[in-house]
Amino acid sequence: MEKHIWEHKKVNTNYYEERPWGSFEHLLDEDYCKVKRIIVKPGQRLSYQYHYKRDECWVIVQGKATVTLDDKVFTYLEGQVVQIEYGTKHRVQNEEEEDLIFIETQTGNYFGEDDIVRIEDDYGRDSNEN
């Protein structure tokens, strides 16, 4: 009988950052993907942006998300999935009275926060500003 040895790799999941719209924490940070838990406070929204080097997949886990994709607005509920290909302009907004929480999975060849091209930002941030 063949023995299977599983190597457990410890991932630093303690990275947490607050932003004007809410917060995020890293759940997984690898060369091939990055996974974040993102919380958007009531009445807040992220910048309208796009990326050159990564796709994103959002799974809504709490609340209702108002999502803009290339100037078209959609509503997503808990359990629904938003697929965002690189180059797609996108934004998520929380118009509800409770926190919006979603899991973001990034795939591509670069996941740095400097791969954000901001088109519009409620907080006056430039493209490479957090």
Question: PLM features: residue spans?
Answer:
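Short beta-strand His + acidic residue motifs that chelate non-heme Fe in jelly-roll/DSBH
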Residues: 47-49, 67-68, 84, 90-96, ...
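Double-stranded beta-helix
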Residues: 2-18, 91-130
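Short, surface-exposed charged micro-motifs
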Residues: 37, 57, 66, 81, ...
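Short beta-strand segments
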Residues: 46, 72-74, 115
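Glycine- and acidic-residue-biased ligand/ion/polar-headgroup-sensing regions
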Residues: 52-66, 70-71
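A generic "binding-loop/recognition-motif" signal
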Residues: 44, 53-54, 72, 88-89, ...
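Short acidic-glycine-tyrosine-enriched beta hairpin
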Residues: 71-89
